[in-house]
Curated annotation (Swiss-Prot):
Protein name: Tripartite terminase subunit 2
Subunit record text: Associates with TRM1 and TRM3 to form the tripartite terminase complex.
Name of the coding gene: TRM2
Major subcellular location class: host cell
A cellular component term, taken from the record's GO annotations: host cell nucleus
Length: 92
């Protein structure tokens, strides 16, 4: 796959077309970009759950981690939303 930065905008399939930093095996579980983003979101949620379950009380660090996860979810949501609009305009 050609690097995202070296291709013209017209040649890119979508705004979320990027060179994968994941191992090739992950494509079996998550073949599309959207499923990879969902997998990332799920893994972050699982990590938080495991940390909170292990600790006896809620701490400031847990709240900071939760806020970071919320921020990542918002970014993922905006990427998908922008890509959807971009593809809609591209088709029309």
């Amino acid at each position: 796959m050609t690097s995202f930065h070296t291709r013209r905008v017209e040649d890119r399939d979508s705004l979320i077309d990027f060179q994968s930093m994941l191992p090739p095996d992950i494509k079996i579980i998550a073949p599309t970009t959207y499923t990879r983003l969902n997998l990332l979101n799920y893994c972050q949620f699982l990590e938080l759950f495991m940390q909170l379950r292990a600790s006896g009380c809620r701490c400031e660090h847990g709240e900071i981690l939760e806020s970071k996860i919320r921020a990542v979810r918002q970014v993922i949501s905006k990427i998908v939303e922008t890509d959807t609009v971009f593809n809609g305009v591209k088709k029309n």
